[in-house]
Every structure is written in structure tokens, then in C-alpha cells.
Amino acid sequence: MLSVPDYEFWFVTGSQHLYGEEQLKSVAKDAQDIADKLNASGKLPYKVVFKDVMTTAESITNFMKEVNYNDKVAGVITWMHTFSPAKNWIRGTELLQKPLLHLATQYLNNIPYADIDFDYMNLNQSAHGDREYAYINARLQKHNKIVYGYWGDEDVQEQIARWEDVAVAYNESFKVKVARFGDTMRNVAVTEGDKVEAQIKMGWTVDYYGIGDLVEEINKVSDADVDKEYADLESRYEMVQGDNDADTYKHSVRVQLAQYLGIKRFLERGGYTAFTTNFEDLWGMEQLPGLASQLLIRDGYGFGAEGDWKTAALGRVMKIMSHNKQTAFMEDYTLDLRHGHEAILGSHMLEVDPSIASDKPRVEVHPLDIGGKDDPARLVFTGSEGEAIDVTVADFRDGFKMISYAVDANKPEAETPNLPVAKQLWTPKMGLKKGALEWMQAGGGHHTMLSFSLTEEQMEDYATMVGMTKAFLK
């Protein structure tokens, strides 16, 4: 399984020396208490570390520099306990190269009417301190996240948690490396894109390799290594021989397992975290990678079919963000246009992620007309029910655009005995007709990432962080 470093977030609160040392000690004590209780809540995926009370431009600037150069730190969380003159934040905020969350909160969640005096008022000035601070971020066009509300409330903690996942994905985005095995499908438009701009904006490195390089690695895989993977497959999934004889079935599965290990070793050696295949580029391969691709996707690798490196990179980012939970490569395949039944049946030839399965996936072997190779093994399953999002990235002359809408996912209304692939049914929440029209008008492609565990807000936050144009359809 691809791992993500154990990041942390540094938390600072703003104030000024005007209030005196005793008040500043109280500010630090309260901020430390907030950090401790956020960590103890069990809601946050990454630790919050309180660093200091920021009172001068010099200290803020030095702090932001330290954040930039500490690889363990994924971002900054700020809070204005008292009034903090925002000119002090200008230089440091301009220098900050990592995600910024402004937590607009207050240490206590009430007004102590019976006891309140001006000492209390001076100490608890978040109401206008946060506005002063928010102004300078808006003036600097920092496009930071603001979470508003009482820090001890579950909904606020959940917002912070979701943002932490996005911020970590942003940091990891600059480590995303896509290995393209073969080129994009010939004459297809939407899978093309500016790889240099993708590396500048999102940090995605995209490299091409000829199929011969990959075949050489696959051929090195030993029978003993395949035996181990076969046993693991038997322990995880249902092995369905179907109409195949035993030897044919087992050989087909073993070919895919050799591909899985060969591709994985190739990716590991080059530090790649995503990959693409293309059924038009299969020189020297017995089968189109089906089960092989699904197992790699299961392990956290991003994937794009037909050379679609943008979806492969997006998939890796979303898998980081979702902790590799219920987030799958998908393609709009066929439609139900009957009134009252409007839906999209999503699938792909072979490569849908088993993380969205509602039943135990079955390892099956069936013919595949496309590609001109032997019958490939694949995982067959039905997707899940619930709320999800469908997301794609397209490249236009003026830059990249993220297009997304919320969907209601369902299971097919009937069995599909002649369709031995993984499949997922869904309908845009805005309606199929309106959703499809607006998707096409925005230039959204047919390859997407479908996620049951991420929110549109998270994807919008990521798009904002990397400076991507957004078309979130409502």
C-alpha cells in the first residue's frame, strides 16, 4: 500500500504586546488547550501542534519561513485570540507556500453576562480580531480557508479534519509522478494536455515509457512470487472459473498477477505513484492489464485508461485525500433515459477500483474484443449506494479546469449476466438532463473519479490551492 508521511499542522494565535505579559500568557494557555483538545477529539487525521503567540512582523515572517522548509509540516492554522494588527502578517503571509486555515473561533462559546468586564473583553477579541486578519488575507488574495464556529463543536472539528486531508493532498500533489505506458488513445482530444503546466500548477510529473520497458520488467517476475499473490487473491476474493477450463482460468489470472508485480516494481523503482495504460499499446503483452490495474488501484496508485494522465494524477491526489477509501476511476458508459429511471451506468473495460464494491468481488476471466489480446482476468462487482461526487480535470488553452457534480449512487435495477465487469449506477443530484448538459457545456470529459468519501467542498479547496478554474455544477 502506498503510504503518506505522518504530517502535522502548526497552530499559532495572533496578539500584540499592548495587552501585557499576563494577558499573553493567558492567550498561549488557551491556544495550547485548544490544540490539546482538538488532538484528543479523535476527529483530526493529523496532529495540531501549537507553536507560539505571534506579536510582531518579524516573528510571523520567521515562523512562515520555518513552515515552508519543514517537510513534516503540511500547513498552518491561525486564530486571533485578541486583536492582532494585520500589517504584521503581510510579509510572512506572502512568503507562505503551504495551505493556510484561518480558524475564526473563540476560546469560550458563550458570553459570561454575570462576570464580564473589560479585562475579559480585551482578552477575548476574536470577533473583531478575526475580521482584521481576514481582511489582509483577502487583500493579499491568499485564497485561504476560513472555518467559523466554536472549536469544540463536532461540525467545526470535522471541517478542520476535511481541510487537513486536502492540505496533505496538496503537499503530496507535488510528489505525484505518472508513468505513461504507451501514449494516449489515438485521435482522442480530452485526454491530451499540457504536461509542463500540470507540473507548474499541480506539481504532477508525467513521464512516457515504451511498452517494451514494462514487458521486460513483467518477464522478470518469478513463479514463486506469483504463487504468493495467487494465494492472497484466493483469501480476499471469490475465484470464479466460469466457462473456462481450470488451466486456462489459472493461467489468465497468473498473467495478470505477473503484470501486477511487474508494473508495481517498475513504479516503485522510479518513485511513480500513478500510471496509465492504453489498449492500443500492448506490444509483447498477453493481456490488457485488468486485474493487475485493479490491484494497483486498490493499493493506492492513481490510474488513467487510454493514456489519460490527468485522471491518473487526479486519482492519486483523491486517494491521498480520502485515505484510499471508496474512491474509484470511472467512465460514463451508457444511459437509462426513461422518465423516472434516469441514470448513468458507469464502468470501464476492466479497471474499476474494488474500494467501491458493495459485494465480494469475483475474479473472473472473459473475452475482451478491444486490444486483440488473450482473455483477461478482472474483478467483477457491483458498486455501492449513497451520496457521492464525480470529478474530472480538463485542459483548455487558458489552463486546467476541475468539473464536478454531486450524485446519488445506486445499484442497477436488475442483474447484468452478460456484462462481466465492475459497474456503478448514478444520477446527478441536479438531474440527469441538467447535469449532463452543464457537464458537456463546461467541457467535462468521460473519464472521472467517483468518490463516496470526499466532498465537493474538499475538491473545491484543492482546486483553489493549485489555482485551477472551477466548474462545480449545482
Curated annotation (Swiss-Prot):
GO terms for biological process: L-arabinose catabolic process to xylulose 5-phosphate. Mn(2+) binds at residues 306, 331, 348, 447. It catalyses: beta-L-arabinopyranose = L-ribulose. The keyword Metal-binding applies. Pathway: Carbohydrate degradation; L-arabinose degradation via L-ribulose; D-xylulose 5-phosphate from L-arabinose (bacterial route): step 1/3. Keywords: Arabinose catabolism, Carbohydrate metabolism, Isomerase, Manganese, Metal-binding. GO terms for cellular component: cytosol. GO terms for molecular function: L-arabinose isomerase activity; manganese ion binding. Its EC number is 5.3.1.4. HAMAP family: Arabinose_Isome. Belongs to the arabinose isomerase family. Catalyzes the conversion of L-arabinose to L-ribulose. This is L-arabinose isomerase. It comes from Lactiplantibacillus plantarum (strain ATCC BAA-793 / NCIMB 8826 / WCFS1) (Lactobacillus plantarum).
